[in-house]
């Protein structure tokens, strides 16, 4: 199990520092914003992208604003950093949309299984009005949705091949802490097991879980490939990452500085995508070199059981409209 005491201390220290800084924030005061990320690698695409955003923001603000990225779960799990951002104890966090599902319901739309036909389709959909509407919808929950980052296609990795949906039956598969993700994996006949990202490696090693589902770069950089060697390309979701800012912090800034932050975030998207494509190719080579087997699957068998997931979660007119808009995007 992960030793949580140092992390909790770090979270409390970060929260105190943020609150003290917020008390004295003035229009002319230089600010070093803090942003969280759970990935270990300092050059992981999302980590690098927020660092790049910080460089852009520093230039746009004439050195007034900077961003320091705390990755490796230094400020907590994705759920913990979301909680900090909501109360203004942390400025930014980069998380997968999964942990935002309950807080900002429209983020469930891009999480839905087999919604996107390709990475290009996902990018085009989220670059347009659909993505803008989903980001905007987070404001009522206390978050400024700034950008979507690529997270590739998520697939199942285990000690054995998962070639059809029947092969997943009964497996304990780690999922994100989201009701939608529990339902998605349960629809396969598996036992969905919510677990923080930082605990997956130990869970796989000890047999607490049989499998996990994620993209190739995470399979590689989180060293999950050391624990299990079979990556079955279910590609059941292309759920993106989302970069959010605390609305409490954002609302204290002048309009011109708010616009700088939004512009820097948007400009970082193309950078992240380039890094993502490079990392995905590199990670695929890495896991193959580590002895991983990449397995093609019968995707139709997985798609066939996902109807109830849509029925359960795509319940509002807005959700249904956005799903159709994605499906109609060419």
UniProtKB/Swiss-Prot annotation:
Keywords: Disulfide bond, Periplasm, Signal, Sugar transport, Transport. GO terms for molecular function: carbohydrate binding. GO terms for biological process: transmembrane transport. Its main location: periplasm. It is found in: Periplasm. Disulfide bonds join 104-138. D-galacturonate binds at residues 39, 78, 94, 154, 174-176, 197, 214, 218, 241. GO terms for cellular component: outer membrane-bounded periplasmic space. InterPro entries: DctP_fam, TRAP_DctP, TRAP_DctP_sf. D-glucuronate binds at residues 39, 78, 94, 154, 174-176, 197, 214, 218, 241. Residues 1-30 form the signal peptide. The complex is comprised of an extracytoplasmic solute-binding protein and a heteromeric permease formed by two transmembrane proteins. Belongs to the bacterial solute-binding protein 7 family. Solute-binding protein that binds D-galacturonate and D-glucuronate (in vitro). Probably part of a tripartite ATP-independent periplasmic (TRAP) transport system that mediates solute transport into the cytoplasm. This is Solute-binding protein Bpro_3107. It comes from Polaromonas sp. (strain JS666 / ATCC BAA-500).
